[in-house]
């Protein structure tokens, strides 16, 4: 330990663009900076300035690799860290190349090397398409002293790397609700997150043609390539639901609460291979919303055993049926929402359990 104060670092990208991992890193960094008993260090990543560059190879990203390496070398030159939290990029080729290049430098910059699997899917990649790249990255990540996962459903990722110290630390978010800001006339369905095939957005728009006409849908988030907001609006028009589908686009985090407050039901049809936790599910529970979600990755584990509406992932028909089933029991939505709010308070509210930052500090002091 560096003197009497542990030196703790976090690497990663802060918003923009908005996304679960970027927002989680921002929250962790804010929590770390608030601690007066440690020295906090941030190693910024700036690989993806816009959502349109997600998982795309660009010269900017190649140059950023060298810049991040230099930042890590400078941290080591300044005495290194007691512990560094490194975010895994995910199972796609571009994130794997990033981790292949940076993981050794991150390992060398700290006494304890901690990795966080917010981006899941490495174990599945190793099982279905075990490329040389994935195998090599798994071996490098296996040099970590500890791995943090958001849910038990993600345990396979650090296990395939050979990491023995695996700790489940769900995201914890501060309570952003306020009785004065809650809409008295909550109405309609809401989706928050990236918009694209892997997130189930096209199927959700298609499903609107088969659900009760009184249900509307609001989509808040950036489109992933090759989609655009206009393409989604054209799709809604194609299925004859454009009058009931409101495609908002991205909004600042402080603005999103107004959409949660006004909604009556949250829908999350993701089938993304990198999905690990679904931060928006915890946010929906915080706002007391009942949930329709795909039975994918950790979704069922996150929402828990309550009366929410879980459907088999990947088929629009199953999504439609889940929404129709939810609509038939609409009178129970306030009760389900209250149950979800209680689950948020016991599991996902900031301070409800040992936080990841507190765990990092304990390890750094050991």
Report each predicted region and the residues it spans:
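Short, structured helix-loop element that forms part of the nucleotide-activated donor/catalytic region
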Residues: 218-243, 254-255, 332
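Short hydrophobic beta-strand element within catalytic cores of glycosyltransferases
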Residues: 286, 290-293
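Acidic donor-binding loop of glycosyltransferase active sites
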Residues: 261-276, 289
């Amino acid at each position: 330990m560096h003197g009497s104060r542990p030196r703790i670092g976090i690497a990663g990208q802060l918003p923009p663009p908005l996304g679960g991992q970027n927002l989680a890193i921002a929250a962790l960094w804010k929590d770390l900076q608030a601690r007066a008993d440690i020295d906090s260090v941030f190693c910024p990543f700036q690989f993806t300035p816009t959502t349109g560059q997600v998982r795309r190879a660009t010269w900017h990203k190649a140059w950023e690799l060298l810049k991040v390496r230099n930042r890590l070398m400078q941290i080591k030159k300044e005495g290194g860290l007691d512990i560094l939290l490194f975010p895994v990029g995910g199972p796609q080729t571009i994130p794997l190349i990033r981790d292949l290049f940076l993981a050794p430098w991150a390992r060398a910059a700290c006494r304890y090397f901690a990795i966080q699997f917010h981006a899941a899917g490495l174990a599945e990649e190793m099982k279905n398409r075990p490329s040389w790249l994935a195998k090599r990255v798994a071996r490098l990540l296996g040099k970590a002293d500890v791995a943090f996962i958001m849910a038990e459903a993600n345990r396979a990722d650090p296990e395939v790397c050979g990491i023995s110290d695996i700790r489940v630390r769900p995201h914890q978010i501060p309570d952003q609700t306020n009785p004065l800001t809650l809409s008295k006339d909550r109405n309609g369905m809401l989706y928050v997150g990236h918009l694209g095939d892997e997130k189930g957005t096209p199927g959700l728009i298609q499903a609107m043609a088969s659900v009760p006409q009184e249900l509307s849908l609001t989509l808040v988030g950036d489109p992933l390539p090759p989609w655009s907001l206009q393409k989604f609006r054209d799709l809604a028009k194609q299925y004859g639901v454009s009058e009931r589908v409101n495609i908002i686009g991205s909004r600042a985090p402080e603005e999103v609460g107004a959409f949660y407050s006004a909604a009556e039901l949250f829908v999350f049809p993701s089938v993304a291979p990198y999905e690990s936790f679904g931060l928006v599910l915890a946010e929906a529970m915080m706002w007391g919303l009942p949930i329709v979600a795909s039975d994918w990755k950790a979704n069922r584990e996150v929402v828990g055993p309550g009366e929410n509406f879980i459907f088999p992932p990947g088929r629009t028909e199953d999504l439609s049926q889940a929404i129709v089933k939810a609509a038939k029991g609409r009178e129970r939505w306030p009760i389900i929402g209250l149950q979800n709010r209680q689950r948020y308070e016991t599991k996902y509210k900031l301070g409800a359990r040992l936080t990841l930052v507190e765990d990092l500090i304990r390890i750094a002091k050991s």
